[in-house]
């Protein structure tokens, strides 16, 4: 069967109504080519430090992208058939071309999803492909992409510049020595790649590597991390080290948004229980909650912006986790409370405008009931954009609809791509800019905004707000 043409409609994601679409076109034209601010994500800094060629289409576009391979897994495709690394570091012996063929044969599974929007953008605009991916074009795609990746124009730094990325933030463990960021800074290359401090491995007593990570934390900092005061000093030391390597933010991926405000004596007793490995689930939750409040206090001193990504049941598929480890598509959103959960932290620091806490959610029911009213009141609180399971166009639209009344536009922070999939970054930002242009065009058409106001908001959402919120 002859493969169909791959094309990107210039009006994709813009309103169907002709009058509103015309407004959206004008708004989008003002933001389409703005530089990309990528203030939170999970790209590998080694790419930019070494500037080595990407290996092939499979290693770049399939293996790191759990948005994609989780969909294939849901249809019974074994992750070994795709060459996904296992928890022990080994991999099935799979020809990357064969893995790509499996992907291509099942590409229809992504129809209508944001992954298809992003990937088709990558195929069309980055690799200049003009036929759709399917079983019949799998080898053509694999050969074309893999050959392109070996050319100078597709080296990581060249793509960074081609994508018009002004700054990108990676995310590292407190145990990371940040040698790649140091190498980038020493290289003379002008691309700006900063890090972010994500202390989860030494904050979550239920993390499978917590005990070993805590030991490394002490060895790295020279602090006695088996005492509460020494543990906090170790965090301050590592935060300063990260800031010296460009960090402007921290990130916290907790099961809930719980915070606490224990006395030093209570915190020490709890910490003693944690380091003995004797913490109950409730004590582990209380410990994470207390550390969040301590991180907020540290942010008042060092100026790092806090990000909180709560409400995900990580590694829901125990068998998959045991075989393949974390970040393999088995993370599931949960109901999440914010009004009660954040109150201890907000009671202590919420009225201090020096604190900047950006809160995300996977529970859309909390947008208008809890998060928008909180962000519309506390000077320390900002709303992160539609995240993960909700960064589809529909999810972005719902976010705007449900937060605008109470939080406005200016208690939000623009867009985060939050991705490991480097080549999809322009596509993700383009989708966000189109959706915001469409949303603003509706407000103009309803005479709720003048078009010049909508233009200013569109530019703010695409560029100014993320720079401001993340101190970039």
UniProtKB/Swiss-Prot annotation:
Pfam families: UxaC (PF02614). Keywords: Isomerase. One of its GO terms (biological process) is D-glucuronate catabolic process. Its EC number is 5.3.1.12. It catalyses: D-glucuronate = D-fructuronate; aldehydo-D-galacturonate = keto-D-tagaturonate. Belongs to the metallo-dependent hydrolases superfamily. Uronate isomerase family. This is Uronate isomerase. It comes from Xanthomonas axonopodis pv. citri (strain 306). The gene is uxaC.
């Amino acid at each position: 069967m002859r493969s169909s043409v791959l094309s990107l409609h210039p009006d994709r994601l813009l309103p169907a109504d002709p009058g509103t679409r015309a407004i959206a076109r004008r708004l989008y034209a003002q933001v389409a080519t703005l530089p990309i601010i990528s203030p939170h994500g999970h790209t590998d800094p080694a790419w930019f430090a070494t500037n080595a060629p990407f290996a092939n289409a499979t290693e770049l576009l399939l293996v790191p992208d759990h948005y994609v391979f989780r969909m294939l897994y849901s249809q019974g495709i074994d992750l070994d058939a795709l060459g996904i690394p296992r928890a022990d570091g080994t991999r099935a012996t799979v020809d990357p071309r064969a893995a790509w063929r499996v992907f291509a044969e099942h590409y229809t599974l992504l129809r209508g999803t944001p992954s298809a929007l992003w990937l088709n953008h990558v195929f069309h605009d980055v690799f200049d492909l003009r036929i759709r991916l399917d079983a019949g074009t799998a080898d053509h795609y694999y050969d074309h992409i893999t050959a392109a990746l070996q050319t100078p124009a597709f080296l990581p730094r060249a793509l960074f510049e081609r994508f018009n990325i002004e700054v990108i933030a990676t995310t590292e463990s407190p145990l990371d020595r940040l040698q790649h960021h140091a190498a980038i800074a020493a290289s003379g290359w002008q691309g700006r790649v900063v890090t972010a401090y994500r202390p989860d491995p030494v904050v979550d007593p239920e993390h499978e590597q917590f005990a070993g990570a805590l030991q490394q934390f002490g060895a790295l900092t020279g602090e006695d991390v088996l005492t509460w005061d020494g543990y906090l000093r170790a965090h301050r030391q590592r935060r300063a080290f990260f800031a010296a390597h460009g960090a402007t933010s921290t990130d916290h991926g907790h099961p809930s948004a719980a915070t606490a405000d224990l006395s030093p004596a209570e915190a020490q007793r709890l910490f003693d229980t944690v380091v003995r490995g004797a913490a109950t689930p409730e004590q582990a939750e209380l410990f994470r909650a207390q550390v969040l409040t301590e991180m907020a206090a540290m942010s008042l001193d060092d100026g790092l912006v806090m990000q909180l990504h709560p409400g995900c049941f990580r590694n829901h598929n125990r068998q998959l986790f045991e075989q393949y480890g974390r970040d393999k598509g088995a993370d599931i959103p949960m109901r999440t409370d914010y009004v009660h959960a954040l109150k201890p932290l907000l009671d202590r620091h919420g009225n201090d405008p020096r604190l900047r806490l950006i809160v995300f959610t996977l529970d859309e029911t909390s947008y208008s009931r809890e998060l928008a009213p909180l962000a519309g009141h506390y000077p320390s609180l900002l709303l992160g954009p539609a995240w993960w399971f909700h960064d589809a166009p529909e999810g972005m639209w719902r976010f705007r609809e449900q937060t605008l009344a109470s939080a406005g536009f200016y208690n939000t922070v623009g867009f985060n791509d939050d991705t490991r999939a480097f080549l999809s970054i322009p596509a993700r930002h383009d989708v966000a800019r189109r959706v915001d242009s469409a949303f603003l065009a509706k407000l103009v058409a309803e005479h709720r905004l003048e078009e010049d106001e909508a233009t200013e908001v569109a530019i703010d959402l695409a560029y100014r707000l993320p720079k401001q919120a993340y101190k970039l």
